């Protein structure tokens, strides 16, 4: 599963995320970063909501309560800032239909081939 961490101080947050083992998460890989946006591949059986909850708890426990950050999923190769909106509605929104993508299926496929 791909999630996106957006934070100015993402290196410290990634350090905190990666220094623990999590039940249900086999591995965490960094695909790429674009400015403060870090695209992560999570090898897991957990859903997006539980991954985010787990990571936020871990960051909070390690002193990250003062950090400003957010996690997002991906929809139609774009960062899904509107997770609360139905997929049917998203399919009508210009943002999700633009040709400029945040993480293409090809980029993800190429990354997964490299990790195997």
Regions found by a protein language model. Give the residues of each.
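Short secondary-structure junctions
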Residues: 21-25, 62-67
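Extreme N-terminal starter segment of soluble prokaryotic enzymes
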Residues: 1-2
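Short, low-complexity S/T/E/D/G/P-rich linear segments that nucleate or cap local secondary structure
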Residues: 102-116
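Short amphipathic alpha-helix segments
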Residues: 5-26
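Short, intrinsically disordered low-complexity segments
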Residues: 27-63
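Short, low-order "capping/linker" segments at domain edges
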Residues: 77-100, 111
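Short proline/glycine- and acidic-rich turn/helix-capping motifs at secondary-structure junctions
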Residues: 33-38, 68-86
């Amino acid at each position: 599963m791909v999630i996106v961490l957006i934070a100015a101080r993402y290196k410290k947050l990634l350090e905190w995320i990666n220094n623990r083992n999590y039940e249900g998460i086999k591995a965490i890989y960094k695909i790429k970063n674009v400015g403060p946006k870090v695209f992560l591949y999570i090898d897991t059986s957990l859903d997006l909501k539980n991954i985010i909850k787990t990571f936020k708890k871990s960051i909070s426990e390690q002193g990250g309560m003062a950090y400003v950050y957010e996690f997002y999923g991906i929809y139609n190769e774009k960062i899904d800032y509107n997770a609360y909106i139905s997929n049917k509605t998203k399919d009508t929104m210009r943002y999700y239909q633009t040709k400029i993508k945040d993480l293409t299926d090809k980029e993800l496929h190429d990354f997964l081939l490299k990790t195997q």
